[in-house]
Amino acid sequence: MQSLPVPKVPECLAYQNRASRPETDSKAGFQSGRRSEPCRRLLPSELMINSQPFGRTGHHSTRVIFGAAALATMRQDRADQVLDTVLAGGLNHIDTAASYGDSELRLAPFLADHRAEFFLATKTDGRTGDAARAQLERSLTRLGVDQVDLIQLHNLVEPDEWETAHAPGGAVEAMAKARDEGLVRAIGVTGHGTRIADMHLASLERFDFDSVLLPYNFLMLQNPDYRSSVEQLLEVCAKREVAVQTIKSIARRRWTPDSTKPHYAWYEPLPEGEPLERGVAYVLSNPQLFLNTSSDATLLEATIAAAQGDHVAPSDAEVQADVSALDMMPLFDGAELERI
């Protein structure tokens, strides 16, 4: 397995230690402070994040993919700091979406200097061909690029939307045409909830997608129906060389009404330390999977640090102890808690 070295952290990334950071930018989801001392984690130049083929695309992606939803509401200066962390951490794959607020706009200045270094993915939630094409063209303009490496049909889980997207004149047909025109290199499909693995299986029967994306964590896989569907999906993807991206690896639960913590993601993430490290290891111990980082950018350094090297899956007892201690709950239950 090819590995990419983590470069030495640039001076522009240096911060004071956590205890002395004076303020948090609530819109940015990234803590600010005097940039004078070394960054907490990303120092040892010998650290590595493993990379592997991203399906049959021909690209070796780091197994941790930057989830650029984190940039959705950030000012440009905060976004630049986060992207410095992405660069210093050795990541080489960015995943954004047309619906992620200002994310594509915040990426544009970075891509002007670093486009060739990154596999760039975005998403469209257009279901008709015209809507998907218009959104793709808008994304290319906002990103400041002529081509994306991967366009994904975003959250394709509802049956009526699925039928529209796959029908003649639908989004799938339009994105295939965009691929023929050189606007995209590959086409994927994404989604949330307990039905999404089954929907991805149906999508792969209808069209030869290059990648899928879905939730994957210990609690989600305690649902026997979801686990069975995920196992079937992974088997199909392995046979067909379809890349499998995972989200919600460090999810703790949905926010409770009485929570006073800053809400940088729509769900409450695991805290830094061993629980987060076990969440990362649970995903990366499966060599087939890629891990897309949380929209909470304050946890990006911790996630990158936890992802170094090879991984052994935590025991069920260890994760169950986290579930009990942290009062963890599944984000999706197939009923009332099925939508984000």
PLM segments and residue spans:
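Intrinsic-disorder-associated, low-complexity terminal segments enriched in Asp/Asn/His/Tyr and depleted
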Residues: Y15-N17, D25
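N-terminal binding-site loop/beta-alpha segment at the start of enzyme catalytic domains
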Residues: R41-F118, A174
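Conserved, mostly hydrophobic/aromatic
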Residues: F54, F66, I94, L107, ...
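Active-site mouth loops of central-metabolism enzymes
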Residues: G67-D77, T122-D130, A265-P271
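Short, acidic/polar
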Residues: M74-V86, D130-L143, R195-S203, L276-G279
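Beta/alpha (TIM)-barrel catalytic core signal, keyed to glycine-rich beta->alpha loops juxtaposed to Asp/Glu
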Residues: D102, L156-I340
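Active-site groove signature of glycoside hydrolases
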Residues: L143-W162
